[in-house]
Amino acid sequence: MDDELADLRRKKLEELQRRQLESQLYAAQQEQMQQELEAKKQAILRAILTPEARERLSSIRMTRPEFVAQIEAQLIMLAQSGRIRSAITDEQLKAILKQAQPKKRDIKIRRI
């Protein structure tokens, strides 16, 4: 009886250790894939943006990371489809950012 209980506990412990190892391996693989994807993304952005434009994007990323991620995704998609012929300058990036920003509502308060 004690041997069966000890055997059962040992098997359960081995199963838990195996599951934990599998989850760690899976997490490591996911992180590796994420890093590779980020490296590819940065390589494409280096190819299609001038240094000034990249600097502008990185400074905007500090305050609006979601917005910059959206712009980067659009730029990468355009580059992969062949619609970007030369490097995007800072001025061109400013125009793209201005177009992509949602329109702000002008709220005026009148006193009566």
Swiss-Prot record:
Cross-referenced Pfam families:
dsDNA_bind (PF01984)
TM regions (residue ranges): none
What keywords tag this UniProt record? DNA-binding
Q: Which GO terms describe its molecular function?
A: DNA binding
Would you name any one GO CC term?
Answer: cytosol
Disulfide bridge map: none
Which family does the record assign? Belongs to the PDCD5 family.
HAMAP family, per database record: dsDNA_bind
* Protein name per UniProt: DNA-binding protein Mthe_1571
Annotated organism of origin: Methanothrix thermoacetophila (strain DSM 6194 / JCM 14653 / NBRC 101360 / PT)
